[in-house]
């Protein structure tokens, strides 16, 4: 064991994941794996206005198809040994490795449940004029035992998707700056992605294992959501970064701030419901100006997280004659005084 937190909810091992997994006695509920994509082939990509190398390290260097299959089969078999009979595994990839992962999972007796498409809402432009921009990654979700009933929080996923069935295409942003305050990893996954995975497939108190832990995003998300974490990685530098991130959320203010941020979906649309008298409502529609009182008194609106996603306004008069309007620009609003509104023909009473 390389590290164990004071609360025993964050355990790290340093070494080859295949070897460490064979020595583990414990059984885990869910595995999240972000194995090498084998993308490091000497190529480049555009970042900002610069052309930078895509090489992540020796561990990500391109291999032959036979070597990729052999590598994936070995670590997947090792994972199967520590997974509970009704447990599930999530594996990330791109077209470079995901087909091999799917084949090896099936060959090892796993049953594929879903293949999630993570569509990045802020993809990095890809160098070249002969192909579409690479903006998606894929996540295979599979269960160990084809006959066992796995856990899926169906109701919560519907709730998170506005009452509709959660689709298998997830539009989520890449890693935000607020996730890199302790440092960063070249293939770091966003906490919001792990939030959805963990909430969908685990219960509070469950144990999640990551055989390619890196900077321990899985562990941070797990602990923020009252799950236990076991992580394995060969890099001492990244394990130290993971420990730093764990210690960062020991601060209560930081813990609750992060807990709130990972549950937010920047792509979610906010609708403001606004009451207006009949004459005021007609004037709002005619002028294209909608106003509402901001503050903390009765009948006013507080500016809260999510307001920046405001895209629609629902106008009504005493709950009747409801009309929905789309803003010209998402999240755009101005603070006007009573005098400014009067110049536009309105007569606000406060």
Question: What are these model-predicted stretches?
Answer:
Residues 257-321, 329-332:
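Compositionally biased, charged N-terminal/linker segments
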């Amino acid at each position: 064991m390389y590290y164990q937190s004071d609360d025993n909810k964050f355990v790290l091992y340093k070494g080859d994941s295949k070897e460490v997994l064979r020595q583990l006695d414990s059984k885990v509920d869910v595995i999240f794996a972000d194995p090498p994509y084998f993308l490091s082939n000497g190529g480049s990509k555009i970042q900002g206005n610069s052309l930078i190398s895509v090489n992540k390290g020796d561990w990500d260097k391109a291999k032959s198809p036979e070597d990729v299959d052999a590598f994936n089969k070995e670590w997947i078999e090792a994972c199967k040994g520590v997974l509970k009979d009704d447990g599930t595994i999530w594996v990330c990839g791109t077209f470079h490795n995901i087909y091999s992962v799917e084949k090896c999972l099936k060959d090892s007796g796993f049953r594929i449940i879903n293949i999630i498409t993570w569509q990045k809402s802020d993809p990095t432009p890809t160098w070249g004029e002969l192909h579409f921009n690479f903006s998606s990654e894929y996540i295979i979700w599979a269960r160990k035992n084809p006959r066992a009933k796995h856990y899926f929080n169906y109701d919560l996923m519907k709730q998170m998707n506005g009452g509709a069935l959660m689709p298998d295409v997830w539009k989520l942003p890449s890693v935000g700056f607020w996730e890199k305050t302790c440092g960063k990893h070249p293939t770091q996954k966003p906490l919001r992605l792990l939030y959805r995975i963990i909430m969908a497939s685990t219960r509070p108190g469950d144990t999640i294992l990551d055989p390619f832990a890196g900077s321990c995003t899985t562990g941070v998300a797990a602990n923020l959501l009252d799950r236990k974490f076991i992580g394995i990685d060969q890099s001492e530098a990244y394990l130290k970064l993971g420990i730093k991130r764990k210690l960062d959320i020991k601060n209560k203010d930081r813990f609750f701030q992060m807990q709130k941020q990972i549950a937010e979906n920047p792509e979610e649309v906010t609708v403001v419901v606004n009451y207006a008298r009949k004459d005021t409502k007609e004037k709002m529609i005619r002028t294209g100006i909608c106003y509402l009182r901001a503050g903390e008194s009765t009948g006013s609106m507080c500016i809260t997280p999510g307001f920046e996603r405001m895209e629609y306004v629902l106008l009504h008069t005493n709950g009747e004659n409801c009309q929905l309007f789309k803003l010209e620009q998402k999240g755009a609003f101005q603070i006007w005084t009573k005098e400014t509104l009067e110049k536009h023909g309105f007569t606000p009473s406060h």
